[in-house]
Amino acid sequence: CALEYGCLEAQNLFLKRWEAPLPTSRSCNAQCFGCISKQNGPVLANHERLAFVPTPQEVFEVTDLHFSRVENPVASFGQGCAGEPLTQWKVLLESVELIRKKYSKGTINLNTNASIPEAVEMLCNAGLSSMRVSIASPTRELYDRYHNPIGYSFDDVLDSLRVAKRMGKFISLNLLVFPGLTDRQDEFANLLEFLDEYDIDMIQWRNLNIDPEQYMGLMGTGPMGDGLMAVIEKLKTLKPQLRHGYFNPFVG
């Protein structure tokens, strides 16, 4: 992963720094239009999907290695080479419990679609530190078009955000941004309302590498927006406490 694929998080593990990866799931309960680890038909995915589910002990051993030798370490469930980690929530739960038996500090993060609020609550109780939730849009209809949820709904995502926030966890949005959609005035208004409603701590601005004609054909066109930099600058003015970045931070 570190040498052939050039995965930055895999490199972090070997270079003893920052955020280490914890891929755990082979399956997913969404069919995102731009999935980077699994595609149907002739289109090739960027990554090969994880071929096995690790045991909690294996997850602990990787985390133990990273936490024992890195200052301000982060370990994250949910990677581009894997499916949705919450589909393996029992493995995650036991893994977090094992980690917290040895380490009271060190950030355990969950990159997720936040589809199972009951599992999110159990993980938070066990010692999860932070959660990064992926959305292509805060608008329900557009969310459904892109993510194609299977067996869950946008309401479940919102419930997970409420649960994690109520329990004092650090919440990031993994916002899949695309000029012509994210910067539209109606989308910005919905994003601002979303940030206020769920008290989001951080936006990770994830530039969506996708065919523009296919994407806008799926999501629909609208009035020309103000540009992504204008959106970011407006948010910095309106919500100065909101953090902006691209990677998961250490939160304790």
Protein language model features and the residues they cover:
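Conserved strand-turn element in the central/C-terminal portion of the radical SAM core barrel
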Residues: 148-150, 160-187
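N-terminal [4Fe-4S]-dependent radical SAM core
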Residues: 1-22, 39-46, 65, 250
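Auxiliary Fe-S-binding modules of radical SAM enzymes
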Residues: 1, 189-252
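Alpha-helix-loop-beta-strand connector modules within alpha/beta enzyme cores
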Residues: 89-105, 154-169, 222-246
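Catalytic cores of alpha/beta
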Residues: 118-123, 180-197
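Local cysteine-cluster metal-coordination motifs and their immediate loop/turn environment
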Residues: 23-40
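Core AdoMet radical
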Residues: 19, 39-94, 98-119, 126-157, ...
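Active-site beta-loop-alpha junctions enriched in small/polar residues
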Residues: 80-82, 113-115, 136-138, 176-178, ...
